[in-house]
Design a protein with these regions (language model features):
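Non-catalytic accessory segments flanking enzyme active sites
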Residues: 58-62, 67-69, 73-78, 88-111, ...
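A conserved hydrophobic secondary-structure block that centers on an alpha-helix together
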Residues: 109-156, 250-253, 262
Length: 709
């Protein structure tokens, strides 16, 4: 059995948070050198003050009494706001909580370990429990006796049931591989055949007297994937039926059903439904299967020949469980459609030249859909819309000058709106469902912010490398900012396709405390940033490491006209995809970037998993030019600035082989660089104090020279 690695970051996007926000903890050691460096005292003085500088006007109000009132807390005191009288009254304090609640099976309500699945699943009526053990599926009945549902799962034959391959958990968000029917009469489960998949051997426990090895069937770009099947077990007959989950032979790349995921039952338990794609992931079929016979039908099909399809679109059932709302990018922008379960399109609910961004509520009694969309003054400002379930009378209900987050009342008569922009802090308001203002409930208090002399974050625009796509950046200034001086710049990055970014939604935040070291912090977007439509994302298809880096380079160039920016002192940092972006920016643009800290980066996409990599790059055999252009090793001879590399020795996501090949290439090219290693650490980032030492040393105390543009 493979040894599971603990202590890993729970999700890829979590690794991007420090990079996106630019917030670091105070020094926790690092030989205390940071204490002696320029800016340290100012940072220590301002760090906590900045993070508490604004009393937010976001009440985080909760609807009660079916929409007649709101409850919220201000300064530790609870209040009830009466919608009819428009008056607030203080409520008694809640009694202190004692003890913790009982956790449920299979993780106590938490997520399974990264890339893994829950090992148990209890039937809805709580009579039975299906569980994964020793590569087989077991069933425990009401008498407590366990019997095997499968028996041929084995490590020797590389067959397993009731669990999934690592790549399915990591890239397709499969946190379970066992699915009970709502009526508790049947249970569906995965079967994985990993025989064709090469193993990766990861050395663990390297700080101990003797190390151990974790063996994982890990398919890398271009190599065979595991073969997946789904079976349905009938509790009464104790027999399993194999579903016809694919259109052809499992090893054929063109077969739709190469990947099978997002498995669930219809509400009436009449069919098991799932999504399936071809290996290239430019065709996705929403599929329904009869659990008694295993026969399957395609409910609807999505194709996007110039890129990849969204592999898990929004799907919301209506109350009759026969109609559902479906999100599709088929027009080039994400829109909503109403279907019946036979696959018949009833109507397009929206047809916008901008992205829909989430369903708030389906009000069938009123015959309307409330949803969010990127229809503000720019794509980063989400708005509340209402449209009839017949696709008519679409209306925006919020002010397009702001970004909105809304909570609709249970009775559908009002909604709470939290409105903000990058330079206007949150205000909470009560509006009726026509969008008419009823009352302003709270405004942010900026008194402390102003007393501290803090500067609001500035938004700027620049053109992408194509010369026409409008992109946005955010600039964070130190409280001591003097426009007559020149400042070094730090650029926190993530940069992956459609990944989380603070330039994807325009919200208010205080300046990054890191600025107090004497830096200006700049966040950049690219055509990989979500929210601009599918055709914009198409620009990066088969070109990871090229287009998004070119766009960020244009953002750095756009700052050159500002006299207080020192273009010879620009640093970039990030983790995971952000680590890849950091290394590539330094290597590809030595005339723009003087220093980079790259944590846990992919360095060549041939070394990463099939599902993620091939979605954007296809296979190396048919896109050699793209893989070569996206490899950090291609550019090592261009290294001029300072490079800090970090990796965890127990990283089972982005394997240490990525870093080893980059280090080897740098050494062969005669290049100098620094390394930091996380012994027995998984997919993680560098010690933040050490990273700040690196940037202060190389951009302030002895700045690396670059040829300015």
């Amino acid at each position: 059995m493979s040894k599971r690695i603990t202590g890993r970051v729970p999700a890829r996007l979590a690794l991007a948070l420090v990079a996106i926000l630019g917030v670091f903890p105070a020094s926790s050691g690092a030989q205390d050198r940071l204490r002696t460096m320029p800016g340290y005292d100012q940072y220590q003085k301002m760090n906590t003050l900045i993070q508490s500088a604004v009393r937010s006007g976001d009440l985080r109000a909760t609807w009660v009494e079916n929409g007649k009132a709101l409850e919220y807390t201000i300064d530790g005191k609870r209040y009830r706001y009466d919608v009819a009288t428009r008056k607030a009254s203080e409520l008694p304090a809640l009694p202190p909580q004692t003890g913790g609640g009982r956790g449920g099976r299979g993780g106590g309500g938490g997520a399974p370990e990264r890339g893994r699945q829950f090992a148990q699943a209890q039937s809805p009526d709580k009579t039975f429990e299906a569980s994964y053990r020793d590569r087989n599926l077991w069933m425990k009945g009401p008498d407590g006796v366990e019997t095997p549902i499968t028996t041929d799962g084995s490590e020797k034959d590389r067959i397993k049931y009731g669990t999934a391959s690592w790549v399915y958990g990591e890239e397709l968000d499969q946190t379970t591989a066992i699915w009970w029917a709502p009526n508790s009469r049947k249970v569906a489960y995965y079967r994985f055949d990993e025989k064709p998949v090469p193993d990766y051997f990861l050395q663990l426990d390297q700080t101990k007297l003797y190390s151990t090895v974790d063996t994982e069937a890990y398919p890398k770009a271009g190599v065979p994937n595991p073969v997946v099947d789904i079976f349905v077990y009938d509790v009464a007959s104790k027999q399993s039926v194999k579903l016809d989950v694919r259109t052809g032979k499992p090893f054929e790349n063109s077969v739709v059903g190469h990947y099978v995921y997002n498995v669930r039952w219809t509400p009436d338990a009449s069919e098991l439904i799932f999504n399936r794609t071809n290996r290239r992931q430019n065709i996705m079929e929403f599929t329904a299967c009869k659990p008694d016979t295993g026969t399957c039908r395609v409910v609807l099909r999505e194709e996007w020949p110039t890129g990849w399809v969204e592999n898990n679109p929004t799907m919301v059932y209506l109350k009759d469980n026969k109609r559902f709302i479906w999100a599709s990018e088929r027009t080039g922008f994400n829109n909503y459609y109403l279907y019946d379960i036979s696959g018949k399109l009833i109507t397009a609910l929206t047809n916008h030249p901008f992205e829909v961004a989430g369903i708030i509520r389906v009000d069938e009694a009123a015959g309307v859909l409330y949803y969010m969309a990127r229809s503000g003054d720019n794509y980063m400002k989400t708005q509340l819309h209402r449209v009839g379930l017949d696709g008519k009378n679409d209306r925006r209900l919020t002010d397009p000058a702001f970004t909105h987050a809304v909570t609709l009342a249970p009775d559908g008569k009002h909604f709470v709106d939290v409105a903000q922009t990058h330079d206007q802090p949150p205000t909470t308001r009560l509006l009726d469902v026509t969008g008419k203002l009823v009352a302003e409930l709270a405004k942010s208090d900026m008194t402390k912010f102003e007393q501290l002399g803090l500067k609001k974050i500035e938004m700027f625009t620049y053109n992408a490398a194509d010369g026409k796509t409008k992109l946005h950046g955010m600039i964070s200034y130190p409280s001591t900012f003097d426009p007559s001086k020149k400042y070094p710049v730090l650029v926190p990055v993530y940069g992956g396709p459609a990944s989380a970014s603070n330039t994807a939604r325009e919200t208010f935040s205080v300046p990054s405390p890191t600025t107090e070291y004497g830096f200006i912090i700049v966040n950049l977007s690219s055509r990989a940033t979500p929210g601009m439509g599918k055709r914009t994302l198409d620009a990066i298809y088969e070109k990871l490491g090229q287009v998004e880096m070119d766009d960020m380079a244009e953002g750095i160039k756009a700052l050159s006209s500002r006299l207080y920016i020192d273009p010879s002192r620009v640093g970039v940092y990030g983790t995971s995809y952000g680590g890849y972006t950091s290394a590539m920016m330094l290597l590809r643009f030595p005339e723009l970037v003087a220093a980079a800290s790259a944590s846990s980066p992919v360095t060549d996409w041939r070394h990463y998993d099939t599902i993620y990599t091939e979605r954007y790059m296809w296979i190396p055999e048919e896109n050699k030019e793209g893989y070569d252009a996206g490899s950090a090793m291609t550019y090592v001879a261009k290294l001029k600035g300072r490079l800090m590399l970090y990796w965890g020795t127990a990283d089972n996501n982005v394997h240490p082989s990525n870093m080893m090949q980059l280090i080897q290439a740098l050494q062969r090219a005669g290049k100098s660089f620094e390394t930091q290693v996380g012994p027995d650490q998984g997919h993680s980032g560098i010690n933040q104090a050490r990273m700040m030492e690196f940037f202060i040393e190389n951009l302030v105390m002895r700045p690396a020279a670059v040829t300015t543009f």
